[in-house]
Amino acid sequence: MTLRKAAILFAALLAIHTGAAAAPDGHDDRKEKRHEEPVSDKGRLKISGYLQPQFQWGEGDASLKVGTPNDNPSESFNRFGLRRGHLKFAYAYKTASAVVQIDVSTEKGVILKDAYIDVKEPWLRTFGLQAGVFNRPFGLEIELSSSVRETPERSYIFPMLFPDERDFGAMLVIRAPEDSPWHIVGLQAGIFSGNGIGQDNDNRKDFIGHLSFGDEFDDFSFRAGASYYHGFVYQGTGTVHTMTDSGFRTETDPSNKGRYAKRQYYGFDACFRFETDLGTTTLRGEYLFGTQPGTQTSSKSPNTAALPASDTYLRPFRGGYVLLAHDIEDTPFSLVAKYDVYDPNTKVSGNALGTGGTGITDALRWAIGFGATWHIMKGLKPVSYTHLR
């Protein structure tokens, strides 16, 4: 297996106007705790944003996130780029709010990130409805903002299963207020278009649900959850390849075209945080498995308005990550180590790869990362991160 590595240095800058807040999305710079917004009789507009300029270096066959690909695989290369530039507008009035967020980068130009409304009932303060374009409610890392995430990028499995993290949809949110004994339990359940932020292109809708349980104590907090995804992918031809123990089984029937392959994921997540005399330690991880419809050359989920026009390949997958982070006491420094893995086809490995219709698309991918963050001031933090794959 080829070993690739890239060192990343970037600075995240934060600017907030017309309203007091610590960081985007209500996050403290080095915390993940969620706090309720106070109910106000007056409308409040908050504008926030951050930039992530990056310098990346990689070995010849590395895949960097900024700049053009390497034209000489025998030599290392480096690139400068603006990985992310988010500008967010959030307006809140009583128990309703609206959010619009755009992203500006050298790689994608200007794109829409979020555009949704959020309404909570004022009596029990427990039930809410969110509708528009927003993060899919699956696990922990998808919803963790880039401005506070310990690593520059999400685990490899998430952009494969959930490109762009967002989707069009409507979601029911159930979580009791903090003064209720039931606040330790939460539920998010919604119906989504299933193809990311591209135009909705069929009558089928996907279901995503996340049930979580967690609490906070003086020097310890925890959160655990389970997620489920039940969706569909359009079959563009009459040929469907289903992975078996001996390779892909091919079924060709003209009636298969226009039908829908099942897209089904299961996920489990947990996060533990400890505070000691040495600082704050975070241990977080997720495990996902299920069935992923794809093509011969990719196991990535659809994220465009165009319907697939190629054969459908059904693969059983699994993957996830484990992350350990530590904020060093009485210093502005944090350390992080992470292992993530994605096996797009659990029925093939080793010497069997390349037989039975399998190929590079079915190969297991893993990565180990180490990094350090310097929290110079609120809203400014250079990060150095090394990625080994």
Model-assigned labels for residue ranges:
Residues 18, 22, 46-48, 387:
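Extended hydrophobic/Leu-rich segments
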Residues 34-64, 72-196, 201-208, 212-219, ...:
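Outer membrane beta-barrel
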